[in-house]
A protein has these predicted regions:
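Conserved substrate/cofactor phosphate-moiety recognition/catalytic segment
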Residues: 26-74, 84
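P-loop (Walker A) phosphate-binding loop of NTP-binding proteins
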Residues: 16
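Hydrophobic anchor at the beta1->P-loop junction of P-loop NTPases
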Residues: 13
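Walker A/P-loop
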Residues: 22
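Pre-Walker A (Motif I) flank of P-loop NTPase domains
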Residues: 6-10, 90-91
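ATP-binding Walker
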Residues: 19
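Small-molecule kinase domains that catalyze NTP-dependent phosphoryl transfer to phosphate-bearing small molecules
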Residues: 128, 136-192, 203-214
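ATP-dependent NMP and nucleoside kinases share a basic, alpha-helical "lid"
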Residues: 87, 98-144
């Protein structure tokens, strides 16, 4: 699936929490040929970053933790250099992330990350999911919610952090392809991604366009 037999294919899945990006990454690992290394936000934030610096690259929009915010560009740079190194060794990489630039000031992280993978085959996928479905998924995982609940829950206001994610994560909206997890299963999303890879990454690719985006 790579344009160069000596480099691994890279797939970046960009979306908000509960958008279904992690499930797509797992489907790719299970279904695609060869090893696909998952270097996404959950691995980096939960298992690599020290607890006192979490949520690391998962820092949500809103500029709420300036002590962590100042480290986020460094964390992302190191992660993307690791992705580049895996690809250089011929390993395929899938990374589910939540890129945004809603910090105390614009940091230009996505453009910087794109430059770090400039010479590699990268498919940048926007993972979309309507906010009402995101809320359903959040409610379904609440530990105190009755599994046998029969009455429809009363409408709840969408929390501000959820709205911020929905507004910020798909800016500037430059992708090679998009999937909507409200209409496609993770397996179907993975198959759509496979089809795009077999067809070829558009030229110029999303990451090539993002290198010059401000």
């Amino acid at each position: 699936m790579s344009s160069d037999s000596h480099t691994g294919q890279v797939i970046i899945l960009n979306g908000a929490p509960r958008s279904g990006r992690s499930a797509i990454a797992r489907a790719i690992q299970e279904q695609f040929e060869g090893p696909w290394m998952n270097l996404g936000v959950n691995v980096y934030a939960r298992h690599i970053t020290p607890p006192r610096f979490r949520p690391s690259i998962g820092l949500r929009p809103g500029a709420e933790q300036p002590d962590i915010e100042e480290l986020v560009p460094l964390f992302y740079a190191a992660l993307y250099e690791s992705i580049a190194m895996h690809s250089a060794f011929g390993l395929n990489v899938v990374a589910d992330l939540g890129h945004h630039d809603d910090y105390s000031r614009p940091l230009g992280i996505l453009s910087d990350c794109a430059r770090r993978l400039a010479e590699l085959p990268v498919l940048f996928v926007g993972v979309r999911c309507p906010v009402d479905i995101v809320m359903e998924r959040m409610r379904a995982t609440e530990p105190d919610r009755e599994a046998t609940e029969t009455e429809a829950p009363a409408p709840e206001p969408v929390p501000e952090p959820v709205l911020r994610w929905q507004d910020a994560v798909h800016q500037p909206g430059i992708y090679d392809m998009e999937v909507d997890t409200s209409v496609l299963t993770p397996t179907e999303c993975a198959e759509a991604i496979r089809w795009q890879l077999e067809r070829g990454i558009p030229e110029p690719s999303a990451f090539q366009r993002l290198t010059s985006h401000h």
